[in-house]
């Protein structure tokens, strides 16, 4: 997840007041005769590596865990604990998500991202918000622009009000019109499904830490999360650009659906390693907020997305977040010497949206920011 609106002074060298690019249009940029525009070229030490090794991540049989078979539960706890303590990434299979929903949600992305620019801009994200269409970060920065487009939605399982409104479906209908009715229905169902799945994974994470099974589930039952479609167009010089720059997710838990185009890389053991797509498996990773909730026991790891020279890559990401006023504090069983202060998700979200570009030090910089503000 990348959240960039405003940066501290020491990061403002990336701020662009007179960026000549108005919108990210990969079709136009790829047909320029000379080279990729400099705005999208990353520094040499951050450019994609060749011959990246494959990261060995455990595959968790979620159905086995949910069966309550003692042996299967114990094995799932062991695998997830080992991964979460080292790098925070693992795969889940037999997760119960309908294959037709996964397939339809992936295919429907083209309905939006292959639309004319004027159509996509109907949903343009407003400054300071997490919802809407973002065209790289054109117009906001002049360096290290990601080679991607995104469409993001806010979601909460408690969002149904007296008139049974549904935020994902209604947002799409309001911004894009009735022609996107099926589009909205599918992604509303997708967000609801991933929210439910994330709560099951939270049960596993809680048990693997030796705390009550329901502790994290109950903490996130009224979550206020973010659901995002990531569209990484092919690039004629993929060795110069990044689809998403190196960062740790500031959120709690990410569930990522990859397509069959590899692109996810994680920085482990001082090198970039890839997590190639596995059919029907979903990638799960720990975010900064969950790292704070576990008092630093489980890790949020640096990762990035690279792009392909031959084909477009599409992913769907559900970022589980607490209700904005929930206090992020480890359970008593994990407290000991505190690694991070108490904070609310709204405070951390404000920091990542207004003050800091997410990277590997976001949580530490946030802690320092709180100290300087005298918030604790």
Swiss-Prot record:
How the cofactor is bound: the record states: Binds 1 Fe(2+) ion per subunit.
- Tissue specificity comment: Expressed in roots. Detected in leaves, inflorescences and siliques, but not in stems and dry seeds.
* PROSITE patterns in the record: FE2OG_OXY
Q: What induces it?
A: Not controlled by the level of physiologically active gibberellin or by auxin. Up-regulated by paclobutrazol.
The pathway is: Plant hormone biosynthesis; gibberellin biosynthesis
- Catalytic-site annotation from UniProt: 313
Residue intervals of the Fe2OG dioxygenase domain: 222-322
Residue ranges that the Swiss-Prot or TrEMBL entry lists as coiled coil? none
What's the cofactor? Fe(2+); L-ascorbate
The Swiss-Prot or TrEMBL record describes its family as follows: Belongs to the iron/ascorbate-dependent oxidoreductase family. GA20OX subfamily.
Q: What's the protein called, per UniProt?
A: Gibberellin 20 oxidase 4
């Amino acid at each position: 997840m990348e959240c960039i609106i405003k940066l501290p002074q020491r990061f403002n060298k990336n701020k662009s007041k007179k960026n000549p690019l108005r919108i990210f249009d990969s079709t136009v940029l790829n047909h320029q005769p000379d080279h990729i525009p400099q705005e999208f070229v990353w520094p040499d030490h951050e450019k994609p590596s060749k011959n990246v090794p494959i990261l060995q991540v455990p595959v968790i049989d979620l159905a086995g865990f949910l069966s309550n078979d003692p042996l299967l539960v114990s094995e799932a706890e062991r695998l997830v604990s080992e991964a979460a303590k080292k790098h925070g990434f693992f795969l889940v299979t037999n997760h119960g998500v309908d294959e037709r929903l996964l397939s339809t949600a992936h295919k429907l992305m083209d309905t939006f991202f292959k639309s004319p620019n004027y159509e996509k801009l109907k949903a343009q994200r407003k400054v300071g918000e997490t919802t809407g269409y973002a065209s790289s970060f054109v117009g906001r920065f002049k360096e290290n622009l990601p080679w991607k487009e995104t469409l993001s939605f806010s979601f909460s399982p408690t969002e149904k009000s007296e008139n049974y409104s549904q935020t994902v479906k209604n947002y799409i209908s309001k911004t894009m019109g009735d022609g996107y009715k099926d589009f909205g229905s599918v992604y509303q169902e997708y967000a609801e499904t991933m929210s439910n799945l994330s709560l099951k994974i939270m049960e596993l994470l809680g048990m693997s830490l030796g705390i009550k099974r329901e502790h994290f589930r109950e903490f996130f039952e009224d979550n206020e999360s973010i659901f995002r479609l990531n569209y990484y167009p092919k690039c004629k010089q993929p060795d110069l650009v990044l689809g998403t720059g190196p960062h740790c997710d500031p959120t709690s838990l990410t569930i990522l659906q990859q397509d069959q185009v590899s692109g996810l890389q994680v920085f482990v053991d001082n090198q970039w390693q890839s997590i190639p797509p596995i059919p029907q498996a979903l990638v799960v990773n720990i975010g900064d907020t969950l790292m704070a909730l576990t008092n630093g026991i489980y890790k949020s790891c640096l990762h990035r997305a690279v792009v392909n020279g031959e084909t477009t890559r599409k992913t769907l990401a559900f970022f589980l977040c607490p209700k904005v006023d929930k206090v992020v504090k480890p359970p008593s069983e994990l407290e000991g010497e505190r690694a991070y202060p108490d904070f609310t998700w709204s405070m951390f979200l404000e920091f990542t949206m207004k003050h800091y570009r997410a990277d590997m030090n976001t949580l530490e910089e946030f802690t320092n920011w709180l100290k300087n503000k005298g918030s604790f």
